[in-house]
């Protein structure tokens, strides 16, 4: 069995993290030539390329597997060192999460773990349809995803669902939907998406109003909190998690434009196996809190 030298693996990791050989060399305090030599040594060991030398570089499938292995080893090693050394550097946990979970339930779920454990979070925000890919590539050690199937050598548990409502302010509804929400009225009503890959509102409008993708005016805003602000100020109608706007709905500041119609996103927690003790604490916290505040039916 081929056993990689973790010093050479760290060179591969640095090139991916720093998005290039020059910055990787600066990060590792070695020359650019030394970085290239270490990666070539790894590639010779495994008999195949580990990097696609694009700008920025990206790992091959085998490179992704090695980076995932490095994440597991680093996590277990740092936890062990934490047991052996007092005052050691807090354990770094890199997690991939979707913006809506971050804006609603995830931080409260981790509050106790963060307050009484020596850890540092590195939260990487990504759409819930793509967070699992970050775990596959070895960029993170855990991911909140809509994918129900675990990756090889990983574990998965169901967290619960976020229900997304199609909402707007009363003023917006009066302006764009004086006769109710109809297909023709929707063609003129601006919506908002998180990025160009966010198709939630498109799927909702196509499923319920037979509107093809791209048929309504759409803003692009990379912020869950900004969705709420845009809806409150009457700029757009939005797909927003019910959990995020309970107060606004109860006060009447926002209204559900299509009562009884919603988009449900079931969320799952993925992480490497075996779990370290600290990751087990994170897992328990996310599952316990998720089962309390997310839809379970």
Curated annotation (Swiss-Prot):
It holds the Pfam family LysR_substrate. GO terms for molecular function: DNA binding; DNA-binding transcription factor activity. Residues 4-60 form the HTH lysR-type domain. CDD domains: PBP2_IciA_ArgP. Keywords: DNA-binding, Transcription, Transcription regulation. InterPro entries: ArgP (IPR017685), ArgP_gammaproteobact (IPR023490), LTTR (IPR050176), LysR_subst-bd (IPR005119), Tscrpt_reg_HTH_LysR (IPR000847), WH-like_DNA-bd_sf (IPR036388), WH_DNA-bd_sf (IPR036390). Residues 21-40 bind DNA. Homodimer. Controls the transcription of genes involved in arginine and lysine metabolism. Belongs to the LysR transcriptional regulatory family. PANTHER family: HTH-TYPE TRANSCRIPTIONAL REGULATOR ARGP, TRANSCRIPTIONAL REGULATOR. This is HTH-type transcriptional regulator ArgP. It comes from Klebsiella pneumoniae subsp. pneumoniae (strain ATCC 700721 / MGH 78578). The gene is argP.
């Amino acid at each position: 069995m081929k056993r990689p030298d973790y010093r050479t693996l760290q060179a591969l990791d640095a090139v991916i993290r720093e998005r290039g050989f020059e910055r990787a060399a600066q990060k590792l305090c070695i020359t650019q030539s030394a970085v290239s030599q270490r990666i070539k040594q790894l590639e010779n060991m495994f008999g195949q390329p580990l990097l696609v030398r694009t700008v920025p570089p990206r790992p091959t499938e085998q490179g992704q597997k090695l980076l995932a292995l490095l994440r597991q080893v680093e996590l277990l090693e740092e936890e062990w060192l934490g047991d052996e050394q007092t005052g050691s550097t807090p354990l770094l946990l890199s997690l991939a999460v979707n913006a809506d979970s971050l804006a609603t339930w995830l931080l409260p779920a981790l509050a106790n773990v963060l307050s009484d454990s020596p850890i540092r979070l590195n939260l990487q925000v990504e759409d819930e349809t793509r967070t699992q890919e970050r775990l596959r590539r070895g960029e993170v050690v855990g991911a909140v995803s809509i994918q129900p199937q675990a990756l090889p050598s990983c574990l998965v548990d169901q967290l619960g669902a976020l229900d997304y409502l199609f909402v707007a302010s009363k003023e917006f509804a009066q302006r764009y939907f004086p006769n109710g929400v109809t297909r023709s009225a929707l063609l003129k009503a601006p919506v908002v998406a998180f990025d160009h890959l966010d198709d939630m509102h498109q799927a909702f409008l196509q499923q319920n109003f037979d509107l093809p993708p791209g048929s309504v005016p759409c803003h692009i805003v990379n912020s869950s909190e900004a969705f709420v602000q845009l809806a409150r100020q009457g700029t757009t109608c939005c797909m927003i998690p019910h959990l995020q706007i309970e107060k606004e709905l109860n006060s009447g500041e926002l209204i559900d434009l299509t009562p009884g119609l919603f988009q449900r996103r079931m969320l799952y927690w993925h992480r490497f196996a075996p779990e370290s003790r600290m990751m087990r604490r994170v897992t328990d916290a996310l599952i316990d809190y998720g089962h309390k505040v997310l839809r379970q039916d």
